[in-house]
Amino acid sequence: MRKSKMWRMLAVAAVAASMTCGVFGVQSVSAADKKTLKVAMECGYAPYNWTQPDDSNGAVQISGSSDYAYGYDVMMAKKIADELGYDLEIVKLDWDSLVPAVQSGQVDCVIAGQSITKERQQMVDFTDPYYYASIITLVKGDGDYKDAASVEDLKGATVTSQQNTIWYDSCLPQIENTNLLAPADSAPAMIMQLQTGAVDYVCTDMPTALA
């Protein structure tokens, strides 16, 4: 069955209209003593970044791994490294490890779909976003909520999203009378819960849903 028939997406009008994607937490990089730009990302957040077994389409090998990373975030990282005249090193980290990696100096920057919040601005600096994505709810095309047309129609569902995101922390709590499960560790884990029927819908961004 085609994906377009399996999934339906509903814009969540009562919550934030968009989130920033591809923002950086940046540390200064001196050209005098650094010739490699170390960029962290999940490598599991399609279409922004994902893991693949080869270098097709210009993918970059992941540090310490035989796998490669590609996606919009990798394309952006390659462009920045080229402009600086640096080599590029992609570091694969879990979502919750991205900001701490910048703070500790493990990496020079992060390119990720992170909303710019006051809490995060106290920990790292952000560039201007390179992309803004609409926040939506994603339901199964044959599920109980396939005909939902408004936030009101989403009441009473079992739901989740990815941990430490505005999807989970800010958006889902605004939908009344839901059974909010513990957050998923990653975007793929979130989608898996929807596919297996563990939840009725998830909150995510439009590109992730389409991927």
Could you describe each region identified by the protein language model?
Residues 78, 87-153:
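Acidic, polar ligand-binding/catalytic clefts
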